[in-house]
Amino acid sequence: MIELSGVTKSFGSKHVLRGIELQLDRGKSLVVIGGSGTGKSVLLKCILGLVRPDEGLITLEGQNVLTAEREAFLARFGMLFQGGALFDSLRVWENVAFRLMRGPLKRPKDEAREIAVEKLRRVGLGPETADLFPAELSGGMQKRVGLARAIAAEPEIIFFDEPTTGLDPIMAGVINALIREIVTEMGATAITITHDMTSVRAIADRVAMLHDGLIRWSGPVGEMDSTPDPYVQQFIHGRATGPIAAVR
């Protein structure tokens, strides 16, 4: 469904992506792991067409992402942002229904609210939450609202950017379980960026290790712990010594 071939991207003299080769089938969940500053966010932006690669090709079902009609293309995606990225001035339901009240996905206001309340229910939040403002919610509740917003428009592809950052282990486990359940129910294709190895094991079908602008290893999550790849082993066990410099 999504394929990257020979993708490179530099910013000045800094080579962020140096020939990415990656493929993800429809309905599968890929988790990209790697240290801070290794290009994971740039990779996502390239897939979305928000950053233009210097070289290489990225296709979605065979179509170049850079030549796709923008609104229709972006309507196929949902995203859970690292910091929640909720609009403080909008009520919870308005945040969830944000894409349903404008653009090609626009619905009547009452219908958009109804969908938002249903998506909130799906992530474990009652209808009484709908008219609150984000500041009235805990961090875990805000993360659930972000997840509800990501799925509100029934996207084919969902990006999760550090979905458990800032959450305690119990709430992180709840979010991981919700992500796995919802992605499976929807039959969506998912790409997740995370440093949290518990999340990796909970939500991944496949894992790709990104370091120094290259995919150093990719494979089924069940093979991650047994691979002899030194980059993967150092990263997943948090070792200070190995091919990845401890100070970057």
List PLM regions with ranges.
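Conserved ABC ATPase "signature" region
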Residues: 109-128
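ABC ATPase NBD coupling module
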Residues: 64-78, 109, 224-227
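Conserved ABC ATPase signature
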Residues: 133-137, 141
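Conserved catalytic motifs of ABC-family nucleotide-binding domains
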Residues: 154
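Helix-to-loop junction immediately C-terminal to a conserved catalytic motif
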Residues: 48
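Catalytic Walker B motif of ABC-type/P-loop ATPase nucleotide-binding domains
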Residues: 158-161
